[in-house]
C-alpha cells in the first residue's frame, strides 16, 4: 500500500483528502503543522507528499526545499498547493514536483497523485 503524507493546517481539507485517498487504497498520514515534518517523513518514508505552502508555523516551500536537498528524500514527489498568491519562481526554487491552487477539484488531485506515483 502506497503511503501519502498530507500536511495542511486546514483540518477540513485534511479530512476530505484523507477520506478520499483512503478509499482509493492509499495509506494516509496527516500533519496539521510544519513542526514535526521531518520526523514524520523519516519515520513513515512516504511515497508522495501533499504540502500546503502557508502553514501556521512553517512555509511549505522551505520544508520541501530542505527535504529535497537530502539525498535520502530527494526522490519523494511533492505536490505544493496554496489558496494565496505565490510567485512561480518560489515554487521552482522549492523543488516541488507539482503545484496546485486551492480550492482544487479532488479529481485533479487524485490524477496528479497517480501520475507522480507512476500509476497513470
Task: Give the predicted meaning of each segment.
Residues 25-33, 40:
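Short hydrophobic/Thr-rich beta-strand motif most characteristic of the beta2 strand and flanking loop
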Residues 33, 59-62:
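Acidic catalytic/metal-coordinating carboxylates
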